[in-house]
Amino acid sequence: MIQIEKMNKVFHLKSGDVTALDNVTLNIGDGMIYGVIGYSGAGKSTLVRCLNLLETPDSGTLSVGDSGVITLKDGKAYDTQGRKMTEKKLGAMRRGIGMIFQHFNLLDRSTVFENIAYPLRYTGMKKADIEARVFELLDLVDLRDKADVYPSQLSGGQKQRVAIARALANKPQVLLSDEATSALDPDATEAILNLLRDLNRKLGLTIVLITHEMAVIKSICQRVAVMENGRVVEEGDVYDIFAHPRAAITRKFVSSASALSKVDKLMEEGSTLVRPTANQKLVRLTFHKDCVGEHVISTVSRDFGVDINIVLANVEVIEDNPLGGMIALLGGEEKQVAAALNYLNENHVYTEVIADGSI
């Protein structure tokens, strides 16, 4: 559905050049909910604007749906025949891509109905057809009773529902969501994510979701790309990224969405709960779906003579698969603890020594 190859974008500012995208390559499957996560300045918002060519990359190629391969060079876009794309062609491509933002960008002096109808005004549709389409969209986002209401009378979650309906007016194949839940409270965020999940299922809609919140990725996405300084530093299935993140920034994001992140605060405070003695190691254990429910902890304690003191533990479900986590103090002779850690790693329990009392 969406293919990006070696995409680059540099902004030339008075203060110097800023590389927003650095050799980005991504493949996003048809009908997928795909997440892109990163901190401010990572390049994720530039990436989403380049997907619909609101911002033209300096180089690379792009293919969205039936657009064919678009070659990007020196800030210009060229079609499969090597011809510079006209505004008409770019407009046709953009109509196949809807977009929602953190700030809803609604017309304050227009009703909900008029806001949703706005993209259809200049398409040549008959008035009756526009009305039918708008009410179809209102039903889709559960706002039919708000058709004649103005944005100022809506909650934040309702405003985002209007923005989603407007983005879907032209029946796009792709919906780009740029921090669409960042301005919402937790309940409204959950409701919008449920709506996006429902639209993905009902319409077969491909959704690219830009966020800085790993909890959002965990809740709705199937795959995720982690961006830092304009580059994709890690990419994969959401479950695999949570189970064994490789890049330092990915580990930080994963930790932020885990109940086990409390260990960091406990360590900062110097709590004795997480302070290993001379013969102990403080270890983070991640239990892959293949071993959740197995008796690995009791086996390690019994067979290797290792004392295990559980400090924190958690099991969550990601993409319908369980993922377990534990912070524990492992005590015993050095060789026994090392053998126990090796056994755990061989049995789909990934281990990370956080602190070592012998050092």
Write out the residue ranges for each language-model feature.
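ABC ATPase NBD coupling module
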Residues: 13, 69-98, 122, 127, ...
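Helix-to-loop junction immediately C-terminal to a conserved catalytic motif
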Residues: 52
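Conserved ABC ATPase "signature" region
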Residues: 68-71, 117, 121, 128-145
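A short, surface-exposed alpha-helical micro-motif characterized by mixed small hydrophobic
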Residues: 217-219
